[in-house]
């Protein structure tokens, strides 16, 4: 098993290319199940979760061909073809590796008339039920069964039917599953209180490129006119706003200057505003965003919430950054109930953090010290890397397979902007 070793204290400076978005890619990949024609995705990141999803698609009968990307951006190109659906069963041994596997449920039941999917795995950051996914499919006429750790969805005779879906709470995954099912349902589907994340906008635009008819893209009300079939397309995966935000925090915590090549301000307003409030310079340029930090960081009060508010996927990284701020910050996690597992590891390095329910009180300190720390989930892992970049001495982050699920070539990218970081084997 690998570990990341960091010798802290270097000011980061240079150009850092932003990869295609993990969360968008995992939503776009199952679109291949919606058409018998070829779907090609470009700017696809090289990540463990993306590879696992590709194996799942192969299991379902999708043929895949990968080629390498060119230029400063590092995305790959994947061509997928699902002329026929060979299987409608997504087995446990693949699905257990990542929660996003549940996103084959909607496309399979929409095109093949049925789907059997193992209940998903992924990061252990709290109770993330799929009941909203299932209720959305039921609103389109699907019959749902739960047994032996699997969920089975069966379309009525003649296929799914358009309907009205009103989400009681905002759910990104349920919105994605419902949207992919609705594009092949008969008639009109209206989705109220739909999630508005940029990754959902990316999904909707890909579906439109495949022939879907969707109104209200980017709003919380989506209206879909179902089609009997979709055609193939080529679509570019959006840049990863969470990766960009994470490396912006790396510039901030080290007092550095990094050009985030490919990052888009429209996708990151809440993140960028948080950085500005903390005293970090943000300067958009043609093709990216420059992040500059000089002097002590200022404390913040932040709450996570669905887009366009501050994203839960940036909470851990901001916590690491604010551990070095001049004053006391207050972070409140409203999305997941168990997303402070990085706190004990940060405190072992000298951070002063107290958790009270969903709220964390972060008192800035002048120095933290390198240590052996254990990654617990994807974003928590990145917070430990950020702390290691500024810590005195050597930090070793163990169980970095979590990082490999969401950050492409992390140690290479950080090394290129001046970090003393390397991947080693735990032996």
UniProtKB/Swiss-Prot annotation:
GO biological process, one term: peptidoglycan biosynthetic process
UniProt xrefs under NCBIfam families: murA, PRK09369.1
Primary location: cytoplasm
Residues binding UDP-N-acetyl-alpha-D-glucosamine, per UniProt: 99, 128-132, 313, 335
UniProt GO molecular function: UDP-N-acetylglucosamine 1-carboxyvinyltransferase activity
Species for this entry: Rhizorhabdus wittichii (strain DSM 6014 / CCUG 31198 / JCM 15750 / NBRC 105917 / EY 4224 / RW1) (Sphingomonas wittichii)
Active site: residue positions: 123
Residues with PTM 2-(S-cysteinyl)pyruvic acid O-phosphothioketal: 123
Known function: Cell wall formation. Adds enolpyruvyl to UDP-N-acetylglucosamine.
Protein name according to UniProt: UDP-N-acetylglucosamine 1-carboxyvinyltransferase
The UniProt record lists the keyword S-adenosyl-L-methionine: no
Highest rank taxon of the organism: Bacteria
Keywords: Cell cycle, Cell division, Cell shape, Cell wall biogenesis/degradation, Cytoplasm, Peptidoglycan synthesis, Pyruvate, Transferase
Protein location: Cytoplasm
InterPro entries, per the entry: Enolpyruvate_Tfrase_dom, Enolpyruvate_Tfrase_sf, MurA_subfamily, RNA3'P_cycl/enolpyr_Trfase_a/b, UDP_GlcNAc_COvinyl_MurA
Pathway stated in the Swiss-Prot or TrEMBL entry: Cell wall biogenesis; peptidoglycan biosynthesis
Reactions listed under catalytic activity: phosphoenolpyruvate + UDP-N-acetyl-alpha-D-glucosamine = UDP-N-acetyl-3-O-(1-carboxyvinyl)-alpha-D-glucosamine + phosphate
Enzyme Commission number: 2.5.1.7
GO CC terms in record: cytoplasm
Chain residues that bind phosphoenolpyruvate: 22-23
Gene assigned in the entry: murA
Family as reported in the entry's similarity comment: Belongs to the EPSP synthase family. MurA subfamily.
């Amino acid at each position: 098993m690998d570990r990341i070793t960091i010798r802290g204290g270097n000011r980061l400076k240079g150009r850092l290319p932003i990869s295609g978005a993990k969360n968008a890619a995992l939503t776009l990949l199952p679109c291949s199940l919606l058409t018998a024609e070829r779907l090609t995705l470009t700017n696809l990141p090289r990540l463990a979760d993306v590879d696992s999803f590709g194996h799942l698609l192969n299991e379902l009968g999708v043929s895949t061909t990968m080629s390498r990307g060119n230029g400063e951006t590092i995305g790959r190109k994947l061509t997928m073809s699902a002329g026929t659906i060979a299987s409608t069963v997504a087995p446990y041994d693949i699905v257990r590796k990542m929660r996003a596997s549940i996103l084959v449920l909607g496309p399979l039941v929409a095109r093949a008339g049925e789907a059997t999917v193992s209940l998903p795995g992924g990061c252990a950051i709290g109770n993330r039920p799929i009941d909203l996914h299932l209720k959305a499919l039921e609103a389109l006429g699907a019959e749902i069964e739960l047994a032996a750790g699997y969920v089975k969805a069966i379309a009525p005779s003649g296929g799914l039917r358009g309907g009205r879906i009103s989400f009681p709470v905002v759910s990104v995954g349920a919105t994605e599953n419902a949207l992919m099912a609705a594009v092949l349902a008969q008639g009109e589907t209206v989705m109220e209180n739909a999630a508005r994340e940029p990754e959902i906008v990316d999904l909707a635009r890909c579906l439109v490129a495949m022939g879907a008819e969707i109104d209200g893209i980017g709003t919380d009300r989506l209206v879909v006119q179902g089609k009997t079939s979709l055609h193939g397309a080529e679509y570019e995966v959006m840049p990863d706003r969470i990766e960009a935000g994470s490396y912006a925090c790396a510039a901030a915590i080290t007092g550095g200057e990094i050009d985030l090549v490919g990052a888009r301000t429209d996708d990151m307003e809440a993140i960028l505003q948080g950085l500005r409030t903390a005293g970090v310079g943000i300067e958009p340029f043609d093709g990216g965003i420059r992040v500059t930090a000089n002097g002590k960081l200022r404390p913040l009060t932040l709450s996570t919430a669905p887009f366009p508010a501050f994203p839960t996927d940036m909470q851990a990284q901001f916590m690491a950054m604010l551990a070095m701020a001049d004053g006391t910050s207050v972070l409140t996690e409203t999305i997941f109930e168990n997303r402070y597992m990085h706190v004990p590891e940060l405190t072992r390095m000298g951070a002063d953090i107290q958790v009270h329910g969903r709220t964390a009180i972060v008192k800035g300190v002048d120095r933290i010290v390198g240590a052996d720390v254990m990654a617990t989930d994807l974003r928590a892992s990145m917070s430990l890397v950020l702390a290691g970049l500024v810590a005195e001495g050597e930090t070793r982050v163990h169980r970095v397979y979590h990082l490999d699920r969401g950050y492409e070539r992390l140690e290479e990218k950080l090394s290129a902007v001046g970090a003393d970081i390397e991947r080693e084997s735990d032996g």
